[in-house]
Design a protein with these regions (language model features):
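Acidic, small/polar-enriched beta strand-loop surface segments
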Residues: 2-6, 11, 184, 214-356
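Oligomerization/assembly interface segments of phage tail-like spikes and tubes
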Residues: 28-49, 87-98, 189, 253, ...
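Short linear motifs in intrinsically disordered
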Residues: 45-60, 201, 238-243, 318-323
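Short beta-strand and beta-hairpin "edge-sheet" elements
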Residues: 64-94, 331-363
Length: 370
């Protein structure tokens, strides 16, 4: 195991700075459809962590750090902040997709019937075309059958409940005067299409390659070959959510438009509980189809079923580090005093790894909720 520091040169290349950074308390986070990151500290001060010119190798938005375990890169991120406290230096690094956050669009873009994944690639092309803006991230060529953007027109329809809906639709646009956060634009596309994404870092000879993996409609697979079992590779009994505090058997989604012209969707399912309705407002939902998708997703998350949201696992033959990734579905087998024996398929949303101890904390949710 080792920690590596490089300098991102801004032209798509990077220069090695150190192959043995003495980091302590390291945690790497690999998110599904999120930036992830890396955090750690150095204490006491290490004089050798300098360039040939005597300058510190750690510079925010210039230095990249990687965790390598058994020759495989298990995490990589860009240094976004550092704080000195006496002899200790704390490092806070954001995953590569975090590079889009708060960055504005500086041109004009308008498309009709465009694949959202093409727009997602365009956002990265626009960002990495800037002087010193190329971080060497290659974006997948994945496509989808979804199309966004229409000729300008007044859209009218009647819902199944007999209500009239009217709103104006038009091209999908990006503009210097309104698009101020490319990261939010990218995530909005991922949610509405939908598609998943995550970043991988791999050795290619002596060069580190960065790839933004896109998956329509999602990434991951059901892993029948792996399992998490209490007493085998689960360190402690997972907390099981039994409350059902946000339970609803019906969801009302209100989207773009005002009053009777508002985009609307109602989705419900029969249950053995009392009828309850949850209301979700999201003005970014421009179509009935988008509102339907949002309502169904919200409904699945509110059915009040037994759920597990976090597990603490160790490296084990039943599920070794690197064998599973965010997006994968894995069976959890545990026991709870109130719920009894629990066997639950969950989807991995995030993996936070301690490379030193080879322990991981996984954020998960039952597969029916995503």
């Amino acid at each position: 195991m080792r920690y590596i520091a490089t300098r991102l040169n801004g032209d798509g290349t990077e220069t090695p700075l150190s192959f043995d950074v003495p980091l302590q308390g390291v945690r790497t986070t690999d998110d599904l459809s999120g930036p992830g990151g890396l955090e750690g500290s150095i204490s006491p001060e290490v004089q050798r962590l300098q360039t040939a010119g005597g300058e510190p190798i750690f510079h925010a938005w210039s230095t990249a750090l990687y965790a390598e375990v058994d020759g495989k890169l298990r995490g990589g991120a860009i240094l976004a902040g550092l704080k000195a406290q006496g002899p200790s230096l704390s490092l806070d690094c954001v995953g590569f997709t975090g590079y889009l956050k708060d960055e504005p669009y500086t041109a004009d873009y308008s498309r009709v019937a465009v694949d959202p994944l093409d727009v997602a690639r365009h956002l990265w092309e626009h960002r990495q075309a800037k002087t010193n803006g190329n971080i060497g991230l290659t974006v997948d060529t994945t496509t989808s059958p979804i199309r966004i953007g229409t000729p300008v027109k007044e859209t009218s329809f009647t819902t199944g409940a007999g209500e009239d809906v009217n709103f104006e639709s038009g091209p999908y646009t990006l503009a210097w005067w309104k698009t101020r956060d490319l990261g939010k634009e990218f995530d909005d596309l991922a949610t509405s299409t939908p598609f998943d994404y995550r970043v991988s870092h791999e050795w290619d000879g002596e060069t580190i390659r960065h790839r933004l993996i896109l998956g329509y409609p999602n990434l991951g697979a059901r892993r029948e070959d792996l399992r998490f079992v209490l007493g085998e590779n689960l360190f402690q009994r997972p907390t099981i959510d039994l409350t059902g505090g946000d339970y609803a058997s019906e969801v009302l989604v209100l989207g773009a438009g005002e009053g009777r012209k508002m985009v609307r969707s109602v989705q419900s399912t029969p249950t053995r509980r009392l009828h309850r309705t949850a209301v979700l407002e999201d003005k970014s939902l421009q179509s009935k189809a988008a509102a339907d998708r949002a309502a169904l997703l919200e409904l699945r998350s509110r059915l009040g079923e037994v759920d597990i949201t976090e597990v603490d696992v160790t490296n084990h033959p039943h599920a070794r580090i690197g064998e599973y990734s965010p997006g994968d579905e894995i069976l959890i087998q545990t026991r709870h005093d109130w719920a009894g024996e629990v066997s639950l398929w969950v989807r991995i949303l995030s993996i936070t790894l301690d490379p030193q101890t080879e322990r991981s904390v996984l954020s998960v949710t039952r597969v029916e909720r995503v």
